[in-house]
A protein has these predicted regions:
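A structural detector for beta-sheet-dominated domains
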Residues: 18, 39-41, 79, 163
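Core beta-strand residues in small-molecule sensory/regulatory alpha/beta domains
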Residues: 25-27
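Exported/periplasmic cell-wall-interacting domains
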Residues: 67-164
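A generic fold-level signal
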Residues: 9-10, 19, 55, 71, ...
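N-terminal post-signal-peptidase region of extra-cytosolic proteins
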Residues: 1-14, 20, 40-65, 144-148
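Short Gly/aromatic-enriched secondary-structure transition segments
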Residues: 31-42
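A generic structural signal for short beta-strands and their flanking turns/coil linkers
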Residues: 34, 57-61, 72-74, 121
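A short, compositionally biased
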Residues: 17-23, 155
Length: 164
């Protein structure tokens, strides 16, 4: 789904990832600007529950970092786990109250949530190819040229919605 126009500068960028359609949409406010093909985690059905499950998380997140030294070309860090993931993890006794508190505090401050709990972490939008098969450990992969456009135009703090 490579469009030949580069992603323009935007006033109010946001990202919507539709897992069933295998797409990443970039909006400026309510206006759809561009759609990209993506690959997901190797077990994409359902919401991410824990580290190593191969699922791509669902919910409301934000970009908390950008990495130009990624082993998958370039990457944008997605703020998984969010407060809802933390609540479910606490109820299921997957994480401790201390870990829950740290996640909620980070999310409330729009910082990087802890990436080392049993909920998992290190969810990125990165290069390496959309291809025909889902191959990541839960990340969202694009072709390198497409992730370069996102990397250049999407700032830290941009909202990311991941839908089933």
């Amino acid at each position: 789904m490579r469009n030949f126009e580069l992603l323009p500068k935007m006033e109010n960028p946001r990202i919507v990832i539709k897992k069933q359609k295998r797409t990443l949409e970039v909006f400026d406010g309510e206006k759809l600007i561009k759609t990209y093909a993506v690959a997901l985690g190797f077990a994409p059905a359902g919401d991410k529950e824990k580290q190593g499950d191969g699922r791509t998380p669902e919910g409301e997140f934000y970009i908390f970092t950008k990495n130009d030294k990624s082993k998958f070309y370039l990457s944008l860090g997605v703020s998984y786990p969010n407060s809802e993931d933390a609540r479910r993890g606490l109820e299921a006794k997957i994480i401790t109250q201390t870990e829950y508190n740290a996640i909620v505090k980070a999310v409330d401050a729009k910082k990087a949530p802890p990436q080392n709990t049993y909920l998992g972490g290190d969810i990125y939008i990165h290069g390496g190819g959309a291809g025909k098969a889902d191959w990541t450990w839960g990340c969202v992969a694009l072709d390198n040229a497409n992730v370069k456009e996102l990397f250049d135009r999407i700032p830290v703090g941009t909202s990311v919605k991941i839908e089933p």
